[in-house]
């Protein structure tokens, strides 16, 4: 089986004690690609994911300012972001978006989101979108500032209904489903997964967060994406190996990976 984890935080401190074992289990489980999300612990730490990508040939990275870190942005942040995004193993800008769950000022989040969308478009890079308790505003910003660019992106940890899925698909997004889709009460999310065309589906973990059944509540890791793959393949009435291979090919196509060898050597931009 060939699997992809299109969204994890391999650089998270929760993995510091046993990261080599995490990588080994991912390989054993059939992970062909891992996308490590380079938001770090705020803007000064955006490059942490790149270090993981430089260490492991099947790991790739993103860089971006998470909406919860928007107030930490300084005059240097976007210059740093553009420099890091030029690294050959950085494949997208993200995760970026809007998060109204916590008390982070909207007047900091919105301009950070829009500026990163514009930067990604200028660099012809996909985006990884985070939205939490902010669907209406997120979709409005994407309609105005991303859809007209004709570039793809990933809706991370998709948790909407089929109508929201269709709206994201209409704007050219791939939809990434994670551990939440395995939860008993997530029937609406599974219904959305049913309506997504096969060539627009991705798998993710968001590790170390949001572990799928049967590991819910425990530390998540990339190898667990296999459990999500089984649930979603069953939901769609598809063979799990074919489903896994399809989502893995989708990821490679989206981010433009043509071989393992690219960017696997140490780079100097950090």
Feature locations, PLM:
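Mid-domain alpha/beta scaffold segments of enzyme catalytic cores
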Residues: 1-270
């Amino acid at each position: 089986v060939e699997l992809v984890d299109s969204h994890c935080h391999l650089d998270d401190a929760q993995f510091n004690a046993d990261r080599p074992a995490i990588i080994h289990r991912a390989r054993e489980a059939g992970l062909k690609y891992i996308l490590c999300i380079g938001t770090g612990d705020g803007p000064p730490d955006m490059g942490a994911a790149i270090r993981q990508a430089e260490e492991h040939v099947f790991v790739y990275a993103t860089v971006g300012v998470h909406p919860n870190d928007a107030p930490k942005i300084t005059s240097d942040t976007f210059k740093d972001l553009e420099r890091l995004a030029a690294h050959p193993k950085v494949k997208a800008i993200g995760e970026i978006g809007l998060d109204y769950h916590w008390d982070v000022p909207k007047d900091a989040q919105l301009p950070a989101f829009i500026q990163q969308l514009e930067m990604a478009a200028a660099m012809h890079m996909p985006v990884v979108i985070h939205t939490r308790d902010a669907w209406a505003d997120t979709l409005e910003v994407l309609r105005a500032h991303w859809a007209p660019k004709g570039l793809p992106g990933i809706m991370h940890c998709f948790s909407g209904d089929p109508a929201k899925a269709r709206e994201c698909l209409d704007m050219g997004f791939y939809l990434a489903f994670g551990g939440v889709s395995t939860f008993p009460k997530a029937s609406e999310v599974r219904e959305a997964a049913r309506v997504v065309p096969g060539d627009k589906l991705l798998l993710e973990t968001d590790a170390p967060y949001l572990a799928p059944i049967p590991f819910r509540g425990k530390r998540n890791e990339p190898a667990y994406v296999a459990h999500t793959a089984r649930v979603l393949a069953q939901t769609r009435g598809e063979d799990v190996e074919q489903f896994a291979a399809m989502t893995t090919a989708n990821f490679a196509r989206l981010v433009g990976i043509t071989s393992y060898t690219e960017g696997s050597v140490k780079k100097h931009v950090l």
